[in-house]
């Protein structure tokens, strides 16, 4: 069985001029995933990592203890890499420039949601980690700047997520398809389990927080009703499945076919998910797996970021389902 390390080295060998920078970064992400996996698996046995940390992040959201732990673990691991010039996280107010000689001469920056769905930890529901890798655009030899992090998603060189569920799985792309690796704790390695993942072109699952229904745009309300209607020709009604962890909902829909929607709403006029930490990496993965991702109208990967913690409405998943949802958004403008 092929391991993640073997796969990365094999892919690197296909590019004679590759210097192994991405290999090193992915090795650090793999290590962080193993550390977070370990701590999540003992969450019920230790009060040190359960519950709230007593702080709020820049979005005004209460941070869980594991949010802080995962963020700090990510930051320390990346600071140790000579390939990484800086880091931005959903849990940090601002980006972090690794202002050392090694950091100033590095060529890559990382953006991450270190622990997506962390409010589920206390009730033993799957959570995840999301990451995104870009080449810096500021001059090598200087500290990274805000502009390095404000790049549109189509400039990503790699993106992925780790889902911590009944098993721990790392899924990533470098722009040449999507592959998944399941962690074998007895060996301490990630093994190839899902090669060349493809999202089915359609499915029977829609994932949306229907408790917010009254706050949604009319186009989304109409699409939900469409999903609930009986129609044998289109295999409706569809099944509603919503975990509350983007990684978990996205992962299920990628394997089984479906659509995930977190739209704008009266309480979140610009959407809730973060473009840079959640939207762009998941959109990159979706497109590489044959799916679609947009804000209801426009391709996510073409959006020019205006703020580090910018929010965005998010429609992602099976191509035909996203297209149908987009039709309702166009037909019922606000």
UniProtKB/Swiss-Prot annotation:
Its cofactor is Mg(2+). This is Fructose-1,6-bisphosphatase class 1. It is found in: Cytoplasm. One of its GO terms (cellular component) is cytosol. PROSITE patterns: FBPASE (PS00124). Its EC number is 3.1.3.11. The keyword tRNA processing does not apply. Disulfide bonds: none annotated. Binds 2 magnesium ions per subunit. Mg(2+) 1 binds at residues 90, 113, 115.
């Amino acid at each position: 069985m092929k391991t993640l390390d073997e796969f990365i080295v094999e892919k690197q060998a296909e590019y004679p001029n590759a210097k192994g920078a991405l290999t090193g970064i992915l090795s650090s992400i793999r290590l962080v995933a193993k550390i977070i996996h370990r701590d999540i698996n003992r969450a019920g046995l230790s009060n040190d990592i359960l519950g709230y940390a007593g702080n709020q992040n820049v979005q005004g959201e209460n941070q869980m203890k594991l949010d802080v732990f995962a963020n700090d673990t990510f930051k320390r691991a990346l600071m140790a890499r000579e390939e990484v010039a800086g880091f931005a996280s959903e849990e940090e107010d601002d980006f972090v420039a690794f202002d050392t000689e090694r950091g100033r001469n590095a060529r890559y920056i990382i953006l991450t949601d270190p622990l997506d769905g962390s409010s589920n930890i206390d009730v033993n529901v799957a959570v995840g980690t999301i990451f995104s890798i870009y080449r810096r655009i500021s001059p090598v030899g200087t500290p990274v700047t805000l502009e390095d992090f404000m790049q549109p998603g189509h400039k990503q060189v790699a993106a992925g997520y780790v889902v911590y569920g009944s098993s721990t799985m790392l899924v990533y792309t470098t722009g040449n398809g999507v592959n998944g690796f399941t962690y074998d704790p007895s060996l301490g390695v990630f093994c190839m389990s899902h090669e060349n993942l493809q999202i089915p072109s359609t499915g029977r699952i829609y994932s949306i927080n229907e408790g917010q229904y009254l706050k949604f745009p009319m186009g989304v309300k109409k699409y939900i009703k469409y999903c609930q209607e009986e129609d044998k020709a289109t295999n409706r009604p569809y099944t509603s499945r919503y975990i509350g962890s983007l990684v978990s909902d996205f992962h299920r829909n990628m394997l089984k076919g479906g659509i995930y929607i977190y739209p704008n709403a009266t309480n979140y006029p610009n959407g809730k998910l973060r473009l840079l930490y959640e939207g762009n990496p998941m959109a990159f993965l979706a497109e590489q797996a044959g799916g679609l991702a947009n804000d209801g109208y426009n391709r996510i990967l073409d959006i020019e970021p205006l703020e580090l913690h910018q929010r965005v409405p998010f429609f992602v998943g099976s191509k035909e389902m996203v297209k149908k949802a987009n039709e309702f958004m166009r037909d019922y403008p606000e």
